[in-house]
Amino acid sequence: MNAFDPVKIGIVSVSDRASSGVYADKGLPALQDWLSRTLKNPIEFMPRLIPDEQAVISATLVELVDAGCSLVLTTGGTGPALRDVTPEATLAVAHKEMPGFGEQMRQISLQFVPTAILSRQTAVIRDQSLILNLPGQPKAIAETLEGLPARGVPGIFAAVPYCIDLIGGPYLETDDAVCKAFRPKSALRAMPE
């Protein structure tokens, strides 16, 4: 038995070509692998592979939040191309916008490629769920979540557990070797035996 709170996590890959079978999706496996290595909590994943259609993306996000996902991560559809509408779909279902997540993702990605400035990742809260738009490439997903520890650049996931605490979700515990979560001392729980 796991002493940590169980958590439902929605993982959504947004891609016209992958959702129509033109090529294999790499986003969902990358997200599931990273989260499984990072979180000590028992996780129920709710994966979705969908096209770049704003109404479909918004409906999928609402469905996952309504199903009890405390965290929903999307990958893909955040660039400037005409079909890239993930941020618009996400903002359309938001109760609160959390712009710091997108700002930090761009800062991390700019360490590697100057075109990261074209990225439009965002984050929002809907009910008691945090929704994060991540980059489309598996390498960039890991970099933005973990940060660049050797350069002293924190990843966005360090703030995710405390954000979820603040909106009434489960207490997420991370493996510090992958990503050390930050919480104020007043928000820390004793470690389960």
What are these model-predicted stretches?
Residues 1-193:
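Non-catalytic beta/alpha edge segments that cap or flank active sites
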